[in-house]
Design a protein with these regions (language model features):
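Bacterial Sec-dependent N-terminal signal peptides
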Residues: 1-30
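Signature of exported/secreted
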Residues: 23-339
Length: 339
């Protein structure tokens, strides 16, 4: 097994949201003298407003310019405003449907489809209740205790299913036991998986931006790698719909990748395997990794998100992985009269 094939997923996970700290020209202004040059992400919602969305999560293997889809799952959700006050909104986020991707060509894709078929019936109908301020910024989740209980049960079921997979025996045969790592999983992180896309949709509510194009460079620090970023803010003067998009390119030194992955290898393998990894890495990896992130948000004039895209490509030695989350609205019922 080539060393760089092992580490691509780990690097992607560690840098997926690197654009969060690389946003130039972000500010908070509510009195805009020139509406044509500023967009404010503000929720103009009403009680009983309802939006449904499809969340499509996919991953691809990239090699020499060719891509092969390895996994995919689609989730249908519904957002409803249950109450509207001067101080903000009470809202509900409900899971309606889950679909696997039969075209995904990998063991991971097969396993993911197995989990979707087995566990989706336990999640469909689950609702997360939350509050926002008057601008639509999420301030509180009301029922995470219930979600935590469900998440723990689903994680245990997924773990049992994972143990049945042939790959587990293959890993053990070469001295690798990932069950140690899995048992250390943080349940809070699993709960975050329920709200991750919801947070993405409301990420910028409560902020305003100046229309235009912006470039920025960040030098390497003790906490962050050097990166180049681009921010684009667009406003349609006819519909007053608007969009925010960012691109970030980060270079991760080969020595840092080796240190990170070496630590993980040591966690669930013996000393000989750690030495083998180190030797193979030095022989094969001669370049730094490049992580490219693309993120975009499109909004209706009333502040409801219409599309959200988050995509990260991690490349090392001519091959890599591409992960994408794409959220698109399906039905829209807004401005309903109070009853």
């Amino acid at each position: 097994m080539k060393a760089y094939s092992v580490i691509l997923g780990i690097v992607a996970a560690c840098t997926a949201f690197s654009s969060a700290w690389a946003r130039p020209a972000t500010h908070s202004e509510w009195d805009n003298d020139d509406a044509d040059s500023t967009v404010a992400v503000i929720a103009w919602f009403n009680k009983r407003d309802t939006m449904t969305y499809w969340i499509n999560e996919s991953s691809w293997k990239v090699k020499d310019g060719d891509t092969t889809k390895t996994s995919g799952v689609s989730t249908k959700v519904m957002l409803t405003v249950t109450d509207s006050t001067k101080k903000g909104y009470n809202m509900e986020y409900k899971f309606l449907d889950f679909q696997g991707d039969t075209l995904a060509d990998s063991k991971i894709g097969e396993f993911q489809n197995t989990l979707v078929n087995k566990l989706s019936k336990d999640i469909v109908g689950t609702s997360i209740r939350f509050r926002t301020d008057e601008y639509g910024h999420i301030t509180k989740y009301e029922n995470l205790k219930e979600i935590k209980t469900q998440a723990k049960e689903l994680f245990d079921s997924a773990y049992e299913e994972l143990l049945k997979q042939p790959v587990m025996d293959s890993l053990k045969s070469v001295g690798i036991d990932i069950t140690t790592l899995i048992k250390k999983a943080d349940i809070a992180t699993i709960v975050d998986g329920y709200t991750e896309e919801l947070e993405m949709m409301f990420r910028f509510h409560g902020n305003s931006f100046t229309v235009g194009e912006y470039d920025d460079h960040s030098d390497e620090t003790k906490k962050e790698y050097a990166s180049d970023s681009h921010l684009s803010i667009d406003l349609d003067p006819e519909t007053m719909e608007y969009s925010i998009s960012t691109t970030v390119e980060t270079k991760i030194p080969s020595k840092d990748i080796k240190e990170l992955v070496g630590y993980i290898v040591e966690t669930f393998s013996d000393d000989s395997k750690s030495e083998d990894f180190s030797d193979e890495y030095d022989k094969q990896v001669k370049e730094d990794a490049i992580v490219s992130s693309w993120n975009s948000w499109k909004y209706f004039a009333d502040g409801w998100p219409s599309e959200v895209l988050s995509q990260t490509e991690t490349m090392l030695m001519g091959q890599g992985k591409l992960k994408q989350t794409f959220i698109a609205w399906e039905t829209r019922s807004v401005g309903n009269p109070e009853k």
